[in-house]
Swiss-Prot record:
EC number: 1.14.17.4
Descriptive protein name: 1-aminocyclopropane-1-carboxylate oxidase 1
Pathway(s) this gene product operates in, as recorded in its UniProt entry: Alkene biosynthesis; ethylene biosynthesis via S-adenosyl-L-methionine; ethylene from S-adenosyl-L-methionine: step 2/2
Stimuli inducing this protein: By pollination.
Any GO molecular function: L-ascorbic acid binding
UniProt binding sites for Fe cation: H181, D183, H238
GO biological process, one term: fruit ripening
Family matches, as InterPro entries: DIOX_N, IPNS-like_FE2OG_OXY, IPNS-like_sf, Oxoglu/Fe-dep_dioxygenase_dom, Plant_2OG-oxidoreductases
């Protein structure tokens, strides 16, 4: 499928007379795509260049040889295993909130650590700006989504970054870079390689390429936003296709609810939908603790999301649906 209509949102347009058109594009992207690209998002190109440099150098120095050894063993045994259960990627994970583990990751030099800390702060700010834009689009009080995400005992979201490399694969017809899945969390910000493609999303039954654009940030709607919006926004199946040439860098940052935050459809949206349809209020999704969902997701990541939502109904918690204060 052609990617020419893929939604690209220029955040500069949100500041002027073209704001209504830009907000309409944002709504369409969240409701009908689940994934879109941001330009002029406020993170400097200089910082993004440093992030790319330090991570590609880290992979070359410390992870490339390890992956080659893993790949050799994998290719030797691929005939005897189910390739649909394999991912052709080299990854490590940085935690930022509620506590950071950057100082504990082996082999990261000081430049890499400080660069990634700086990048994480910028991404955290961008995620929160985007959440407020989504509140505006949805007709929710400003700050509502952040308040839900920070509704756990420590008053913080869960925020972390998955740093991935997808090296050349000699048998891309057998092994995916990363198998198809939706993301479990809230809002995902991806800084992807602009020289090597591979990211695809499922749109109208067809896989469509997400075009690499230099210095853009790809935004992905996670399962929790689907729940909070009572299905108005949708998380989307996406995957990474292994390539025979080029090493693809992918830096995905996940701004998620706190582990014990309670997730449920926003009452204002449920009521609004009922009024528009002139029917009784109906919460399509259950109320649950985010960590309970994650515990299930870890086992069911590469399966359909709908059974996960259904499974959460069996442990649905009883709670008051009073408005969440945002001030």
């Amino acid at each position: 499928m052609e990617s020419g209509s893929f939604p690209v949102i220029n955040m500069e347009l949100l500041q002027g007379s073209q704001r209504p058109a830009a907000m309409a594009l944002l709504r369409d992207a969240c409701e009908n795509w689940g994934l879109y690209e941001l330009l002029n998002h406020g993170i400097s190109h200089e910082l993004m260049n440093r992030v790319e440099t330090v991570n590609k150098e880290h992979y070359r120095r410390f992870r490339e040889q390890r992956f080659k050894e893993f790949a050799s063993k994998t290719l030797d045994t691929v005939e005897n295993v189910e390739p649909e259960n394999l991912d052709w990627e080299s990854t490590f994970f940085l935690r930022h909130l509620p506590t950071s583990n950057i100082s504990q990751i082996p082999d990261l030099d000081d430049d890499c650590r400080s660069t990634m800390k700086e990048f994480a702060l910028e991404l955290e700010n961008l995620a929160e700006r985007l959440l407020d834009l989504l509140c505006e689009d949805l007709g929710l009080e400003k700050g509502y989504l952040k308040k839900v995400f920070c509704g756990g005992s420590d008053g913080l979201p869960t925020f972390g970054t998955k740093v991935s490399n997808y090296p050349p694969c000699p048998k891309p017809e057998l092994i995916k870079g990363l198998r198809a899945h939706t993301d479990a969390g809230g809002i995902i910000l991806l800084f992807q390689d602009d020289k090597v493609s591979g990211l695809q999303l499922l749109k109208d039954g067809e896989w469509i390429d997400v075009p690499p654009v230099r210095h853009s940030i790809v935004v992905n709607i996670g399962d929790q936003l689907e729940v909070i919006t009572n299905g108005k926004y949708k998380s989307v199946l996406h995957r990474v296709v292994a390539q025979t040439d080029g090493n693809r860098m992918s830096i995905a940052s996940f701004y998620n609810p706190g582990s014990d935050a309670v997730i449920f459809p926003a009452p204002a949206l449920v009521e609004k939908e009922a009024e528009e349809k002139e029917e009784k209020k109906k919460e399509i999704y259950p109320k649950f603790v985010f960590q309970d969902y994650m515990n299930l997701y870890i086992r069911k990541k590469f399966e359909a999301k709908e059974p996960r939502f259904e499974a959460m109904k069996s442990m649905e918690i009883v709670m008051s649906s009073q408005p969440i204060p945002t001030a």
